[in-house]
Amino acid sequence: MNKIIKIFKSLLVIVLLSSFGFQKQETCSLTVDVSELRNSKGTVQFALYNREDALPDEHYKKYFKKLTGKIVNGASTVTFENLPEGKYVVNILHDENNDGKIKRGIILPKEGIGFSNFQSIGISNRPTFSKASFSVPGDKKIKVNIIYL
């Protein structure tokens, strides 16, 4: 009888642990649209950031995830999958020459760039994580404006 009780208790513990302690973490997706690209040359680089110290990232090396989107009729869309809920920033680059880097003039970029929550960018209006971030509590879709300087 004691053996049956021990087996029953063990099974009960296993069932409780598997239903409460090992639940799969919920993930979500983020779809990002950009339109009004000045031409259909190259691709669009979509960099996703999830850390305060990741911006600025002028060399595209501090991102959490990065996707490349094809350009169709002056627009591009990608979807980041399996994201944990949290705060994110999206940075886009219209990579017209497909080299994976921002082509620069003397100071300013020659290719289009954009950040979530930004309508314009300038020397006095540089994106930071706190200014450009947004919450992703579940599946979400956003639009990022492309800016040519």
PLM ranges: what are they?
Residues T68-G74, V136:
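Short proline/glycine- and polar residue-rich coil/turn motifs
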Residues F80-L83:
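Short, flexible loop/turn segments at beta-strand junctions in immunoglobulin-like
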Residues A47-E52, P56-L67:
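Short amphipathic beta-strand segments in non-cytosolic proteins
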Residues H94-E96, Y148:
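Surface-exposed loop/turn motifs at beta-strand-loop junctions within extracellular Ig-like
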Residues M1-S29:
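Bacterial Sec-dependent N-terminal signal peptides
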Residues G86-I92:
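A short tyrosine-centered beta-strand micro-motif
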Residues G21-E52, I102-L149:
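Primarily secretory-pathway and cell-envelope proteins
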